[in-house]
Amino acid sequence: MSRIGRQPISVPKGVEVTIDGKDVKVKGPKGELKHTVPPSITVTLEDGQVKVSRADDRPQTRSLHGLTRSLIANLIEGTSKGYTKTLEISGVGYRVQAKGRNLEFSLGYSHPIVVEPPEGITFRVEKPTLLHVEGIDKQKVGQVAADIRSLRKPDPYKAKGIRYQGERIRRKAGKAGK
């Protein structure tokens, strides 16, 4: 059995898990999320814990077992605590500012770049060089943060651009002089 898949997921107070056929709905203080479970995986709710089991031992089913358990755990954590990705902007003249719900980036291009948040995502600008992407869906938060990072990836020579907080940029040596 999958080591991750066999671990039960404890449901914290204030979070309600509903299993309706192959749909798992999680409702918490921050919002509501839903996940459809693959046909070969079964999800049960027993005394405050969600348990994930599989029907057979085929390789595909075995891989889906641990994945499903992790996805449901992410739903529970997202609806109770939420997720945040922090991005740092470094470089001369590189900055971000909030314009209502949208973000306006100055990244050395001839024009400012405006980014609209998708549904369920909020932006928080702490400083002109520090941005927080927040939401309850872990996948969506990570995808939006990756899309923002791709606007100006960190340069390996000067390390300027948008990077995740704590991300180490592998620096390259410049051209060797004479």
Swiss-Prot record:
Record-annotated membrane-spanning stretches: none
Cystine residue pairs: none
Keywords for the protein's UniProt record, in alphabetical order: Ribonucleoprotein, Ribosomal protein, RNA-binding, rRNA-binding
Gene3D superfamilies assigned: Ribosomal protein L6, alpha-beta domain (3.90.930.12)
GO terms (BP aspect): cytoplasmic translation
GO molecular function terms attached to this record: rRNA binding; structural constituent of ribosome
Source domain of life: Bacteria
GO cellular component, one term: cytosolic large ribosomal subunit
InterPro entries, per database record: Ribosomal_uL6-like, Ribosomal_uL6-like_a/b-dom_sf, Ribosomal_uL6_a/b-dom, Ribosomal_uL6_bac-type, Ribosomal_uL6_CS
Matches recorded under Pfam families: Ribosomal_L6
Task of the protein: This protein binds to the 23S rRNA, and is important in its secondary structure. It is located near the subunit interface in the base of the L7/L12 stalk, and near the tRNA binding site of the peptidyltransferase center.
Family annotation (NCBIfam families): L6_bact
Family recorded in the similarity comment: Belongs to the universal ribosomal protein uL6 family.
HAMAP family the record matches: Ribosomal_uL6_B (MF_01365_B)
Binding partners and assembly: Part of the 50S ribosomal subunit.
Protein name: Large ribosomal subunit protein uL6
Species of the source: Thermobifida fusca (strain YX)
